[in-house]
């Protein structure tokens, strides 16, 4: 008796895409962190842009603009929450992504590894200049 997911034309498409995916057997949940980094970065950029629309950098009114965002802007509190916690999630995913590369020996591909290290240093420098120094 054949399996219905392999004989039905509609289920066959879904089966070949999701169930019997042609992927290596060494794929594990550790390999999701690259795409999670992309999602976190996208959320950071979008929430940062929307927060920057309402933020005032003048020293006399900066705190008032933050309270304005939280109280008067629709879901402004959520934007601020997502932006603050998204940065932490981004760095957690980044360090786990590098840790996965160390565990699986990706450092042997020196060109790719060196580009990744340069990106890591650039992200850390940007976070330091943008969030720690001001």
Curated annotation (Swiss-Prot):
Which cofactors, by name?
A: heme b
Family according to the record: Belongs to the cytochrome b family.
Q: Which UniProt keywords apply?
A: Electron transport, Heme, Iron, Membrane, Metal-binding, Mitochondrion, Mitochondrion inner membrane, Respiratory chain, Transmembrane, Transmembrane helix, Transport, Ubiquinone
Task: Identify its membrane topology class.
Answer: Multi-pass membrane protein
This protein's name: Cytochrome b
Identify the coding gene. MT-CYB
> From which source organism is this entry?
Platyrrhinus helleri
Quote the PANTHER family the UniProt record gives.
Answer: CYTOCHROME B
Further remark: Heme 1 (or BL or b562) is low-potential and absorbs at about 562 nm, and heme 2 (or BH or b566) is high-potential and absorbs at about 566 nm.
